[in-house]
Amino acid sequence: MSLRMLLSTLRRHSLMPILVALQVALACAILSNVLFMVQQQLAPMLAPSGIAGDELILIDQMTPRQHPWSAADVRRGEQALRQVPGVRDASAAFGLPMVSGALMDMALQGGNGAKVGVNGYLGAGLVKTLGLQLVAGRDFLPEEYRDFGMGGVGNAPWDAGAPQPVIITRALAEQLFDDGQALGKVLTDPGDADDHGYRVVGIVRHLLRNQLSLAIDGRSDNTVLLARRIGSTSLLSFAVRVDPPISEATRTRVAEAIKREFGPTMKADVIPRISSYAERRANAFKSHRAALWLFAVVTVTVVVVTVIGIMGLTGFWVQKRTRQIGIRRALGARRAHILRYFLIENALVAGSGAVLGMLLAVLGNRLLMRHYELAHLPWRYLPLGALLMLVLGQLAVLGPALRAAAVPPVAATRS
């Protein structure tokens, strides 16, 4: 049968095709947005951290009772932790993966003019403590560090006119420079009027940012290490690298060292949080896993309802046209012809529904952006959702189409 005759048949019996197309359109709109939201939840979970996660104990929520801790207090704390049996290294830090209490965000601009939002980590010896892999350049030299005081108190000034040394990730280097060659180059902060720039002295393979909500669309490694050691501070965090696997005895000794060094000057009603990186990661992604389960239920429900709906409507349509199918068989149509006819017919109906569904997906995404701060739906999810609906439509119509192909020519003589 020609395409013109097929379209003519659809126009004469338009109710069933319209119902199928509307069902496909609604399912396509839902699936396109759900697939996008699944990717948003999965992206930070699948992003490589770049650190020795199975060897890290993270300590935060440390606040002083009265006056801020001095740089000397922080140095004594680091030394006390390094002397704990089983501890390989320890660094006081401002900003760590899976630690959201201390957050530094900034914008960097490189050779290609692009402004890239990044998270900054500060602390002496973080490359070694976190177990980062340098792929180019070097670690900071001891004489390059300057004290960083919270609120600007105790900040050591940088050399006049000299750019600060920084270590960035390989992904960030590729965003800031078209050729990815950032080593030795100077970056700028467009939002800082007194900025003298940042000279890249090293590049690490990966380092996960601590703003997990932004760790999507290739931005999970938008992280920079600054040559600053923790000075005067009223909010203290430590990264402690221990011999694997992390034992309860080592964790207890680390907690005792913190209590011994900072207990007398620490707020009694604020208990420091001491846990492994794996525990922090599990807690940080708890809401992501719950969302993924919800999206899985929605996806399965939409798929099942769509398939059942198409099968039911198409089956009813086949039943109504049994005599017409029998006439075609009597006129010489083979089973393969009947099967192909229904598959093509379904592809046309589902295809038109998918086109409408892509438009509905965009409109639905606009509503979600307005009311729930969802990101803009990338265009690639539109054809993906449409393709899924076309495949589902073909699978759903296969059963009724096979039954139609099995109709004998004698059915044309039945009333």
Where are each of the predicted segments found?
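Structured, solvent-exposed hinge/loop segments at the ends of secondary-structure elements
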Residues: 35-172, 192-196
